[in-house]
Design a protein with these regions (language model features):
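Two-component histidine phosphotransfer core
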Residues: 1-15, 19-153
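C-terminal end segment of the histidine kinase catalytic
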Residues: 160-163
Length: 163
């Protein structure tokens, strides 16, 4: 069995150490002025790590979207006031089973790219489609700027399959 902290056989890691360090730093920054926020951030980080470090398996698209919501709340704690988030209701998701991280990984890459490009807010909207999700990123403060669209397919296994 692989060690989830050390990573996978292909050299990838289920969790970015850089991300975890940044979330812990964000939580530390809230301790004195906003202790409830600090506790919430640490609880969300615990949920995030629990989901990502459980090992190889598949989950429902709804469970993965719930995990994506946790991830996005952690990013909002790291970048206060910079991320607006819109997620579809779980009932609108396709009935698919996917690997944990199949949605969060491309989403985190896109968010990181957009946050580093320039200061300002970034709106992140995921919309359910029959066979996946559409990710839309844009800057609400700059309506004329072209946004970015990314298609995230969700079709690993039929909903009735178990692994």
């Amino acid at each position: 069995m692989q060690d989830p902290i050390q990573g996978r056989a292909d050299g990838s890691s289920p969790v970015s150490v850089h991300f975890v360090n940044n979330v812990l730093a964000a939580a530390a920054s809230y301790i004195e002025e906003e202790p409830d926020t600090a506790r919430d951030v640490l609880a969300e980080l615990g949920a995030f790590l629990s989901h990502r470090l459980r090992g190889p398996r598949v989950v429902s698209a709804a469970e993965e979207l719930e995990h994506v919501g946790v991830y996005l709340r952690l990013e909002q704690a790291r970048f206060p006031g910079r991320l607006e988030v819109e997620l579809p209701a779980s009932r609108d998701l396709p009935q698919a089973r996917i690997h944990p991280g199949d949605v969060q990984a491309p989403l985190s890459q896109a968010i990181e790219r957009w946050l580093r490009q320039q200061p300002g807010r970034v709106r992140v909207a995921l919309r359910a489609r029959e066979d996946g999700l559409d990710l839309q990123l844009d800057r609400p403060d700059e309506p004329g700027e072209a946004g970015e669209r990314l298609r995230i397919p969700l079709a690993l296994e039929a909903a009735g399959s178990t692994t």
